[in-house]
Amino acid sequence: MFHPRARTMLLLSLPALIIGVASSLVLIAAMKVASVFQQFLWQRLPTNIGIAYDSPFWIVGMLTLTGVVVGLIIRYSPGHAGPDPAIEPLISMPVSPSALPGLLLALIIGLAGGVSLGPEHPIMTINIALAAAFGSRLFPRITALDWTILASAGTIGALFGTPVAAALIFSQTLSGSNDIPMWDRLFAPLMAAAAGSLTTSLFFHPHFSLPIAHYTQMRLVDIASGAIVAAIAIAAGMVAVWCLPRLHELLHRLKNPVLILGIGGFILGILGVIGGPLTLFKGLDEMQQMAFSQTLGAGDYFTLAVVKLAALVIAAASGFRGGRIFPAVFIGAALGLMLHAHVEAVPAAITVSCAILGLVLVVTRDGWLSLFMAAVVVPDTNLLPLLCIVMLPAWLLLAGKPLLAANRHEP
């Protein structure tokens, strides 16, 4: 009844569905545990002790302790809590399963303790390793590369609550040929992403969109304004690109993860005191609080953006286990709100979306993901043509530039 091509796609459907659901469940479990632990550390415990959770003493002490604990996990756990996210790309080949318990624990403690990183890199590493380990036993004919693709697609769908991001990302990597069309190659990853996003939606829905005034009509001056905003965001991001490898090398001369992460946590605490609680944690909930605030002005948004960018660099350079996409979105939103407050003639929809596009592009060097993040934070169809046009000069600015990554050091 089905063409051989269709049968091949159907054979991959079951593994794709399983991987997508499992990828989402791993993410949900980690986020739920981290959320409960965060509430204990930042609400119940300081209340019981009689200390304000936003007091300098508590912020510095909690982040320093978080760094020390994560450092102990990295030093003494099997596999040293997986690869350093500052060195490895978001999607890479499977790591040893023995490293996963330490990696998961380091992620949860970092998220709960207020470290300015998201869950995407460790969750991606965990899901890829689990998929390759169990999948190769259940379906030995499927290669490790295929398991990597399915797990990463399922994780992307789960993280962003939609399979669209996975479809965009893998459409540029899984190019078709005369024998195998692109959509044949996309079928299984897209199914994994759909399963991951649907499973996530049963428990919670990632809320990215901000309450920003509707953008009515594109004008030529708006294109120029958007390009300038994106260029400013890229310039800010390139400061982080310059700082990260140098700071990473400087800190890792100490050799001891406990000392490195303890110092990193202490610096994060100092930054948290300067920027306030909004600059802590992964940034999505804090971005909503920032956008809904009626008291913040241009100077406040600037402080939030600078402190969060510095915290992102410190956290990544120290070796905390976490991703950089979610904090980059927060930084872009803060930068965009600051620019709109300075020049109110430029709509906030343009400043926020184009700043996010520029920052995420620096962090990921993925045009589709950058467009996607800008579009979901400011969900306005009138903006899509403008964002696509603004992407062109932004991509030119970053062509051939170094990535936001540290260099691998000899032990």
UniProtKB/Swiss-Prot annotation:
The keyword Lipoprotein does not apply. Belongs to the chloride channel (TC 2.A.49) family. It is a multi-pass membrane protein. The gene is yfeO. It comes from the Bacteria. It is found in: Cell membrane. CDD domains: Voltage_gated_ClC. This is Putative ion-transport protein YfeO.
